[in-house]
Amino acid sequence: MSSQLNDPTPIPAQSSLSFTQGFLLGQLSVVLLIAAFIKFFIFGEAPPPPSRGLSHRSATHRRSNSIYSSTQHDGNTRTLREKPSNSNVLRPVPSSATNTRSILRKTYYTAIPTNPSSKHGRHRIHHSSHQPESLDWFNVLIAQTIAQYRQTAYLLKDSPTSSILSSLTAALNNPEKKPSFIDKITVTDISLGEEFPIFSNCRIIAVDDPNSDGGRLQALMDVDLSDDNLSIAIETQLLLNYPKPCSAILPVALSISVVRFSGTLCISLVPASTPPLDTPSHSPSPPTAQTTTTGRSKREDQTGGSHSRAGGSSEEPSGENPPKTSPKSNVAFSFLPDYRLDLSVRSLIGSRSRLQDVPKVAQLVEARVHAWFEERVVEPRVQVVGLPDLWPRMGRTGVRTGDDSETGSNAPRSSTAADASGPAHHEDSSREPEVLRFGSLLGTRPPFDLASRTSSFNVETGDLRSRSMTREESSGNLSDQFHMPGSLPGGGVTTT
């Protein structure tokens, strides 16, 4: 009995084994939970966001885009290991990308057709129910641009070839446009004005156009300009060449001022795939988008070819292998026929016994100016301007003056910034007049008034001009390569 009581009781080993198993099982479950969280919550694919207009989209609209959707789905499911061919790198653009309805829907703009019938053979216009815009910000940008052009013209007033005086003189005396009974035309006064055009009431309309899918969009905006200081004055002589050349000479002095201009400006985009615009056959057709681009490319090719031949380049001549130019988009602008252009024409005819402000001369000049304007920028005629290349390039990169950052100090400055800041240090600000005027004094020809022999005339008031700048006539080094678009049709004073 005593031996049985003294024997120690053996401790079971199952308790320590069960604790180890439970600890390992708990660690394994935690690892599995972390792995599942990382796999399904972090690396899992997010569901596609619902479309904004999915609830309002009909079944027929979804089926109409099935072709493009299948193409896009095939492109998205393409693995990274598959190397696409060179022709399939750029994804296809849907056929409705340039549709006016699609553009208006994506930009949240409404254009509701209110006049279904066409009038006078013109395209049907769909007026917009969107509220018109004031364009105050656009007026500020346009005013800054015009002010910069005026300042640039003033800084280049002494240049023999780049000044506005020499350019206008070369344009007015173009031998191909000027008739033989008009002597050399001399510009005696130029005023670039001091006011700016005001744009307002901008609205977008949809116009039916068979050349584009779904028509095209036009921006209509009202323009108003009232500036009495926007004028030009010239002097010339009418020659009587019968029975012999220069049998009689009649001095003529004219001044034209734009009192007020108001109208509706139409701006639209002309895609590169659109055929050239049609123009009436009774007048010279303005340059279309294709002809403008082709002419510009030909001039660039000729200039580039001459430089390459002068530099001894090993490239082939441009005539054998002409470079291919890609089509270019353009912007077309015009004015509606209900414009208003008020002019003030002053005239002085004769040398000894003078006729001042002849009404018939004023009527003829106003008729010529209106005809010149209507043949170029009044509907159905439009002016086509190519869109510039807006791709960022290092050659056009500039740094704003006054920035002290390290990047700005090390970055190269463009030539435009250097040219704009260069003349400002050499030009005295006190010499700038309130109204930019340029004049040239003619000592051999009498001015408007006998008391103003030593100064150029001011046709707006008829008396001496106090604020205008006068300078001697240029030495005649006019640029032969200058070309100004537009001209006064027929006889009389013509422009290039």
From Swiss-Prot:
Which membrane topology term applies here? Single-pass type I membrane protein
Record's compositionally biased regions (Basic and acidic residues): 75-84, 424-433, 462-474
Domain of life of the source: Eukaryota
- PROSITE patterns listed in its UniProt record: SMP (PS51847)
Q: What is its main location?
A: endoplasmic reticulum
Per its UniProt record, what Pfam families does this chain match? MMM1 (PF10296)
Compositional bias of kind Polar residues: 65-74, 85-96, 407-418
The protein's job, in short, is: Component of the ERMES/MDM complex, which serves as a molecular tether to connect the endoplasmic reticulum (ER) and mitochondria. Components of this complex are involved in the control of mitochondrial shape and protein biogenesis, and function in nonvesicular lipid trafficking between the ER and mitochondria. The mdm12-mmm1 subcomplex functions in the major beta-barrel assembly pathway that is responsible for biogenesis of all outer membrane beta-barrel proteins, and acts in a late step after the SAM complex.
Per the entry's comment, what about the domains? The SMP-LTD domain is a barrel-like domain that can bind various types of glycerophospholipids in its interior and mediate their transfer between two adjacent bilayers.
Assembly mode: Homodimer. Component of the ER-mitochondria encounter structure (ERMES) or MDM complex, composed of mmm1, mdm10, mdm12 and mdm34. A mmm1 homodimer associates with one molecule of mdm12 on each side in a pairwise head-to-tail manner, and the SMP-LTD domains of mmm1 and mdm12 generate a continuous hydrophobic tunnel for phospholipid trafficking.
The protein depicted here goes by the name Maintenance of mitochondrial morphology protein 1
Lineage from the top down?
Eukaryota, Fungi, Dikarya, Ascomycota, Pezizomycotina
Which gene produces this protein? mmm1
